[in-house]
Amino acid sequence: MVWLNLTDYKKQEYMELRLNAPLGEHIRLDFNPLKVTDTSNSSPSWKNWHCYRKPLRIYSPDFDILVSYFIKAYPIIDASDNTERDSFDVCFDNWIKQDDWIKIIHNIEVDLINFSKEEKEFLNTFIDWITDALQHTSVIVVEGNL
């Protein structure tokens, strides 16, 4: 089961993806798939995007390699309120829809030839996690704590 009960967010098991980030690093991006509810016209609560059993966590400076691809995808339509967002925010929530993830993944895959073996493994693991998460949702909320 990929989803926890909405009250069990403390049971999440973050997958920490590291390339060069030191173990003591605290600045990070968390990737939380949104659990879509059957209730129409309701705004998702914090619990709806903190109930995926194995969310992804990437620390600074490792997320810098990804942020450049996020920036290329903007402007996007924010999935939380359907307003246009001009830029990716490493300090706050970014509600990214499946179509935008597909663009981001494509742009990474086109560039894979330019990376070292370790960087390719990092990026391919990221792509695999996003692709798997998108089997269960159409929105992934990326939260930064910078």
Describe these PLM feature segments.
Residues 140:
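Conserved GNAT acetyl-CoA-binding A-motif
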Residues 1-136, 145-146:
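Acidic (Asp/Glu-rich) sequence patches and key acidic residues
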